[in-house]
Structures are given as C-alpha cells and as structure tokens.
C-alpha cells in the first residue's frame, strides 16, 4: 500500500506526468513519451506524417475544446511542465529521438525541468528509435532499467550505477551501468 509504482506510455505517459503533479501516493513512476507542455506541442506536427498536432489537443485525446487562444488556462492547467515544482515522485522518462508521434523535446523539457529543480529523474533515449523501441536490444535494455528503477524505489534494492552516476554519452552502448552499488 505504501510502495506503489506507476508506468505509462504515450497518452499514458502524459497521464503519469500529470498525475505525479497532483499526488504523492506513488513511490516511483515511469513516464514514456509524454506530452508535458500542451502549448508548445500544439504548434507542432507529427514528424512521420506531417499532420498537425492541433486536432488532438482541441478535440480528441486532450479534449480541451478549442485553441490555446480561446482557452489558455485549460492548456496551462493540463500541462505538467507548469507544475514540476509539485512533483516529489522519482521519475524515469523514456523518450526516443526519432519519435514521430510525440515530439521528443517534450521529454527533454520534462527531464531538464525536473533536474533543474533537483528532482530525482532519469531520461532514457534510444537513438534512432521511434515512439516505442522496436530493436530487441533496446527493449531488453529498457526493461532491465525499468525493473532496476522500480526495484530500487519499491523494494529497497541497491541502486545501479546508471542511476547513481549516469552513463557518459561516449560510453553509451559500451558501458550499461547495470551493476548494483553496495
């Protein structure tokens, strides 16, 4: 009851990002490919199709009901980025740089804001991967890291090197940092 974790991807990733700004019930959370700033994402396109992203905020998934100029407060209130200071839950974020559905700068914005405020957070990016990692080695890596993350926060297991020290960009794919620190 006191060791609850939560995970979601895409729309679910947004829901996790939003949820942790409203409650501290979760001991750890993973947010995959989240939209965290509906105002900046509104003006974007889906990179793989070139379609406008505006419709999804106005009438489909987000159901805001109109444009940011008609309902600025709704866009503001539904964008987790503006409530980062209220997040107390450790967060693992996965957002890939070839994501054609959700602009990956949304994940970067989220991560950089969390780190700026000293919040425990990690960003995983699988270079060249789209909305969800399709290469088996990336899926395996993601599952290992997600399990280590939740095991650390929910079961009190030792922290792995990648969470404690990070992995320098030049060592990506060479040194995984899976080793647990005693």
Question: Where on the chain are the PLM-derived regions?
Answer:
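Active-site-proximal cap/loop segments of hydrolase catalytic domains
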Residues: 1-182
């Amino acid at each position: 009851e006191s060791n609850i974790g939560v995970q979601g991807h895409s729309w679910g990733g947004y829901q996790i990002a939003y949820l942790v700004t409203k409650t501290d019930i979760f001991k750890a959370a993973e947010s995959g490919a989240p939209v965290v700033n509906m105002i900046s994402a509104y003006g974007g396109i889906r990179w793989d199709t070139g379609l406008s992203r505006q419709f999804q905020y106005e009438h489909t998934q987000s159901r805001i009901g109109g444009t940011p100029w008609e309902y600025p407060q709704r866009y503001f209130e539904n964008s987790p980025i503006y409530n980062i200071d209220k997040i107390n839950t450790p967060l693992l974020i996965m957002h890939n740089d070839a994501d054609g559905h959700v602009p990956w700068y949304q994940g970067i914005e989220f991560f950089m804001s969390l780190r700026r405020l000293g919040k425990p957070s990690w960003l995983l990016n699988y270079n060249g991967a789209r909305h969800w990692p399709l290469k088996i080695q990336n899926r395996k890596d993601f599952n290992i890291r997600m399990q280590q993350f939740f095991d650390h926060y929910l079961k009190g297991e030792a922290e792995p090197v990648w969470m404690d020290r990070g992995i320098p960009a030049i060592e990506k794919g060479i040194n995984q940092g899976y080793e647990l620190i005693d």
